[in-house]
Every structure is written in structure tokens, then in C-alpha cells.
Amino acid sequence: KPTDRKEAFQMLKAISGKTHRVVTGYSIQGPGISLVDADIADVTFRNLEDWEIEFYVKSGSALDKAGAYGIQDFIGMVGIEKLEGSFYTVMGLPIYKVYQALKPFILEGRDLIMSYEL
């Protein structure tokens, strides 16, 4: 995460017109499961104009984001040219992979609930 607006601007300028890799790790711990994994997405930004970066940075959104941007924010919507991988991985939680890991436990719980008689 950037420490100030100047650093946020520099970070966004550095990825402008380039592809960068986002790696999001997660851990699931509990009875019957101990999993540590990660997912990868490649994000390509078009060449951003300085005024677009300044507009986004001045909104304050860049300061609380890893990489100084949120894929769901203005700069992500208008600046990302290509995404290879999961949108949610870039947001910070690879939902699909987490769901697949938890699915057996969800099904187990569902079967318990469905077998309960009122």
C-alpha cells in the first residue's frame, strides 16, 4: 500500500501500459482442514494519462489498496485492458478457490440440516 498520494501516483505510473502479476494467498484452518494456497492473476493496464491517475489518487481510494488501485474502482474500470485470472483474486480473495476448498464441508453441513426432522 502506498504511504501517501505521491507514492500512489508513482506506483500507478509504474504499472501504466504494463502487465503485472497479482498473487493472493489464503489459509483455511479448522476441524478436518488445514490448507494454505494462493491464486495468481495477470493484470494489464493501458497507458494511463497523468490526469486519470491524479483524479483517482485525489479520490483517496489509492491509499488503502495494495498496488495503489482497486480493480473495482474507477481506475480499474477504465484502465485495465486485460485480465488473465480471477477478478476476485485481484480484489484480495480468490472466492472460487476458497469455495471449492470449503465445498465438501458445506455439503456435509447441508446433509445434516436436510436430514433434520421438524
Where is each model-derived feature located?
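Anionic-ligand binding patches
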Residues: 1-118
